[in-house]
Amino acid sequence: MSKKRIYEYAKEVSLKSKDIIDALKKMNIEASSHMQVIEAKEIAALDKIFKKSDTKSEVKSEQKAEAKKEEPNKEQPKKEEPKKQSDQKRPQNNNQKRNPNHRPGSHNKPGTGGPSKNKKGKGKGKQKPEPKQEVPVVKETPSKITYEEGITVGELAEKLGKDASEIVKNLFMVGIMANINQSLNQEAIELICDEYGVEAELEVVVDATDLETYFEDVDANEEDIMERPPVVTIMGHVDHGKTTLLDSIRNTRVTAGEAGGITQHIGAYQIEYNDKPITFLDTPGHAAFTTMRARGAQVTDITILVVAADDGVMPQTVEAINHAKAAEVPIIVAVNKIDKPTANPDRVMQELGEHGLYPEDWGGDTIFVQLSAIKGDGIDDLLEMIQLVTEVEELKANPKRTAIGTVIEAELDKSRGPAASLLVQDGTLEIGDSIVVGNTFGRVRAMVNDLGKRIKTAGPSLPVEITGLQDVPLAGDRFVVFKDEKKARRIGEARQQQNILAQRQESQKVSLDNLFEQMKQGEMKDLNVIIKGDVQGSVEALAASLMKIDVEGVNVRIIHTAVGAINESDVTLASASNGIIIGFNVRPDVNAKRAAEAEGVDMRLHRIIYKVIEEIESAMKGMLDPEFEEKVIGQAEVRQTINISKVGTVAGSYVTDGKITRDSQVRIIRDGIVVYEGQVDALKRFKDDVREVAQGYECGITIENFNDIKEGDIFEAFVMEEIKRA
């Protein structure tokens, strides 16, 4: 059997090429064009489907033809010879189905003429196929249906297995007039479903391109849920020993098998303590921490706050506390450098107490660990406390699901292309997985751990670096693995398009200028404020004054205060929290200015406290929904009415008081009673459109959607003015 093109085979079996293509697709054979060549084995498979059914249909048609031959011959004694000849010719005409010259009338006349109606045998023969055509297909009424919002009467009837006219009738009986194409609300759908004893459930349409939906809890067997390692971030002031502590933990906890391995800097690493792994994010302080939070990624389970025992709480320490509190993660305080002679741990505890971190010895709930990162003292105590907090937090994951997680770092490598460091938060990541990362996608080509070793799988809380992406993602972007490569590609491309559109229509950050519009659109009633001042007294006084502003429905939220110039870290925090920065007798540095411009953060610089209060208070009052009052601006008396086709009734009027404006609303008063209230549609003097007509002048007025104007009516013009809040 030789090869053939699809259209050739279709011609052989008297079918359309599309039917053959559909059949090939059902057999999982790729087919897209009628010109495609099909192999001998594929032809054989098609023959089984089409030639077998063709044979059956031919046999049936022959049997029917023979039956039709016999029946006329049995009842021919009274017929003349010419009739017999015509009957004998008839089967030949039946076989010529595609003859364009064949007329339906000529085919029916010999068999369906007058004589056939008078013969009982002939009548019975004709009625045999009728019952087959009239057998009604009865659909069973389902016990439960799901429906999308905006379902029509016809679609509901189809789901219920009922006739649409029956649904229309039932709706009419409950007082709802609807046609087959009309959308139904939830109440109407439930009424109809109750009538048939069917449970109705609204189907929630999920946006497949929203990666956050894949992070929501999914159904999983309890057996599949397992404990996962904690993800820890170390934060603190610049010289308090964060890097030394990280190195100390890593060097003392590297297993024998890992010793001598080349460390791969992927932004995170994992160590083992008491046979339990702990993942540390090796990020550059709280800046990256906040950047991730600004993009909506919550990756950290525990924050280690490093404070030097000889230095105490410093500005960056306070910033780190505020970042951790804003992210709502538990804090463990590591009091470092206790080996120094000038160390004073009690002073550190007292200073941290001023920021809401009280040690357990003082009746608080914050864990304090004293250690020396250089000597390695207290490291074990810190790791034990991390494991204790982990047990309390009950961190769980399902390693059997497809992987989801967050990007820690990303770069464009000259030799490998886009490379991304990922933290697997749930599921298991494998080589070859189809993955969507932020606004890009690809397949996992290679995967290495923090020691630079190539691995094939990565479970929950394990940091890895992958290659194989189309583009470089951003730190904090989410990633999701899909089983279907086509689906991953489709979602990835859709997210790229959405990102392009979002960049074009990027919304502004909140500022005092656009605050009212932001609040109206987002119904946000909180104003996040960061205060930087020249002296602590001024900062505290300003914060206290702002907190005293009493405007109903609006709250001032001080998220950070400090002494010193406005820096880049302040701008990052303001951007993440969608807040504003107030500088009192201080200026922003060069990096802060550049960052504020790039992030769209509003900075307000002042030297007088009451002006700050006045400006903030004004903005907050604008945040509330405005109140309006009516102001009457004029009256006019209708002297004459003229009806003009396509325009309506024009009222020839005389302004008796004030003025009538084109954009004003009017109240039509007749015999002291208000008969209509609406908008001025047109205002003219002679043939010219005018914006307003003053007292003592005549004009022509038409009212929007109202023509029942009579002579003697009074037009009262008014506008709605916004009331300024006290």
Swiss-Prot record:
The keyword Amino-acid biosynthesis does not apply. Residues 227-396 form the tr-type G domain. It is found in: Cytoplasm. Residues 261-265 are annotated as: G2. GO terms for cellular component: cytosol. Residues 117-126 have a biased composition (Basic residues). The keyword Nucleotide-binding applies. Keywords: Cytoplasm, GTP-binding, Initiation factor, Nucleotide-binding, Protein biosynthesis. Residues 336-339 are annotated as: G4. Its main location: cytoplasm. GTP binds at residues 236-243, 282-286, 336-339. InterPro entries: EF-G-like_DII, IF2_II, IF2_N, P-loop_NTPase, Small_GTP-bd, T_Tr_GTP-bd_dom, TF_IF2_bacterial-like, TIF_IF2. Residues 372-374 are annotated as: G5. Residues 282-285 are annotated as: G3. Residues 50-90 have a biased composition (Basic and acidic residues). Residues 50-141 are annotated as: Disordered. One of its GO terms (molecular function) is GTP binding. Residues 236-243 are annotated as: G1. NCBIfam families: IF-2 (TIGR00487), small_GTP (TIGR00231). One of the essential components for the initiation of protein synthesis. Protects formylmethionyl-tRNA from spontaneous hydrolysis and promotes its binding to the 30S ribosomal subunits. Also involved in the hydrolysis of GTP during the formation of the 70S ribosomal complex. Belongs to the TRAFAC class translation factor GTPase superfamily. Classic translation factor GTPase family. IF-2 subfamily. This is Translation initiation factor IF-2. It comes from Macrococcus caseolyticus (strain JCSC5402) (Macrococcoides caseolyticum). The lineage of its organism: Bacteria, Bacillati, Bacillota, Bacilli, Bacillales.
